[in-house]
């Protein structure tokens, strides 16, 4: 994934709602309880962790029992320390004090709360990249340092792998044609990191790598769920049982959910977007343009999928008086630069969201060579009377502008192919007139029509017309 191309826009929940979600996550709520529990008698070791004698008391405060109680309590303490909920007061004595961020959980803004939660998320993601170190003592070298080679662990590669998985999960979650609120099967997520995009049938070696990645991700998502990043259905334990053992019950190997299912929470979307922004990606959120000018709206939504563009435009319109908003949109839609056709298309889509109060602004541009065509379309759709018919030159100019916008928005899509076929079918002399249209994109549009039209004779006519258009403009 390149950090130069914008990611699809994400629809985030309000910060106040996300802050409430953050405070209710098991991990942050435990960290906060331990921070408030800590007092003058609390002691930490050289690494800042609770001394062994105090871990049981911490687990009891949190209501934790069972084999994982001590580990979960220690993890909550580490999060409290990493996020500034507690601070080490005296390293030599091992004493602690309340950190400056503890008060933010009750007295700070939603953004303050989310910043604390983001710190907890970073701690957990870092922890998730660390393998199970049961054989840690055997991996210590003579100087007491970890021998990563013996552990077969590359910290940088492991962190990059998890970052890549989370980025892919984010992309799947925000894609217009993605799974939306549906969970993503763990095998599909693992395969997105392992299987080359141009590979047909995966080899046995690749399938084994996918299986290993699934098992790794199963451990990692179990660890990340308590911080509120994901909702996770783990891999069915029966799948990991010894194959020589008889299964306790009949299992359905076709049930993909048994192989793990993961879904980003609204809080998780917020957190991963923040990480992507920090890493230098352009990761827009719907609503980012609501307080900006019409030029920023039309340019900014140019690459948005249609539903996201509409949602962004609705928020933009909601903050403005309709007639003034329409005038601003029309002014921003003017231009003969390469991006202008797509701006006019987005303007036309925005105009479909306003009512009859916009009519005066549309009538004002009826004689405008760039806007008169789309103004007539809007007025006709709204049943306006006394609308002068467009000239033939305006009709052809609008046609070229529309195809240029579709090319910019979708490339060689099936929808554009159908539009091209329809134009050639409805106007027998289309190419004879079209090459004369005084539009910067005329030659490009005619070349595209020649490329897209399935009829070889008509495609040849389009290419000839494109050549004439370029010759006319000295190209």
Positions of PLM-derived features:
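Structural detector for internal amphipathic alpha-helices that build alpha-solenoid repeat scaffolds
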Residues: 191-195, 299-300, 309-320, 342-354, ...
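Short, amphipathic alpha-helical interface elements at domain boundaries
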Residues: 1-206
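Generic helix N-cap/helix-start motif at coil->alpha-helix transitions
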Residues: 290-295, 304-311, 326, 337-346, ...
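Alpha-helical adaptor scaffolds
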Residues: 315-317, 377-430
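Alpha-solenoid HEAT/Armadillo-like helical repeat scaffolds in large eukaryotic proteins
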Residues: 235, 288-289, 296-301, 328-338, ...
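Amphipathic alpha-helical scaffolding segments comprising HEAT/armadillo-like alpha-solenoid repeats
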Residues: 221-223, 294-295, 322-335, 355-366, ...
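C-terminal engagement modules used by replication, chromatin/transcription, nuclear envelope/ESCRT
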Residues: 223, 229-290
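Short amphipathic alpha-helical interaction segments
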Residues: 67-82, 208-236
